[in-house]
């Protein structure tokens, strides 16, 4: 077992992390360009992803590689369900469906859960630590961009059972380092974490077209307003 799986994961996914931040949808989101239609589709996709992750982690909770990082307080499925009820209504489960990229993502999670459970560590690391690290910032951006007036619609970012995000993340990283893996298995987990980033990027890329439409509408609206002002000024 290597000295620190947590360090290997952090250093081994640096490039993928940077690439994910530069996907158009993510850049637009961070820039405050978020509409409810695209956002609710993202939440729907994440519901399927987390349902798969949490199902497989539960099934493998006694596996030597999973047991150290089995923290039910991280589970997102219930929180996502509350958000989906807000955006789609009470019949949301019969309305949503995974996008093509999301289905590929979900299939992979179930596949490794059945054949190589230790690789689930990579997907848990990529998603959960990412949510804990940037969740509150993304929540603030989403609420501002979509003019949400109450706490509904962004439950995904709330970890109610975790009192201190920083302490929990440190404990999680320490738990990663206790997982009994060979050097080869560690490298496989790092490789899988990079695959996880790629799967997330493909899922985000499917949402790009909606963002492009929004930006185009904003530009057209701005141009029309400017043109109207010019016409009125000329008339005066």
From Swiss-Prot:
Location of this chain's protein in the cell: Plastid, Chloroplast
UniProt-annotated binding residues for heme b: 17
The EC number(s) this enzyme carries: 1.14.14.18
Catalytic reaction equation(s): heme b + 3 reduced [NADPH--hemoprotein reductase] + 3 O2 = biliverdin IXalpha + CO + Fe(2+) + 3 oxidized [NADPH--hemoprotein reductase] + 3 H2O + H(+)
Any one Gene Ontology BP term: heme oxidation
Lineage top rank: taxon: Eukaryota
Primary residence: plastid
SUPFAM superfamilies: Heme oxygenase-like (SSF48613)
InterPro entries, sorted: Haem_Oase (IPR002051), Haem_Oase-like (IPR016053), Haem_Oase-like_multi-hlx (IPR016084), Haem_oxygenase_CS (IPR018207)
A GO CC annotation given for this chain: chloroplast
Keywords: Chloroplast, Heme, Iron, Metal-binding, Oxidoreductase, Photosynthesis, Plastid
Pfam families reported in the protein's UniProt record: Heme_oxygenase
Molecular function via GO: heme binding; heme oxygenase (decyclizing) activity; metal ion binding
Class in the EC hierarchy, top level: oxidoreductase
Function noted in UniProt: Catalyzes the opening of the heme ring with the release of iron. Key enzyme in the synthesis of the chromophoric part of the photosynthetic antennae.
Similarity comment: Belongs to the heme oxygenase family.
Protein name: Heme oxygenase
Source organism of the structure: Porphyra purpurea
Lineage, broadest ranks: Eukaryota, Rhodophyta, Bangiophyceae, Bangiales, Bangiaceae
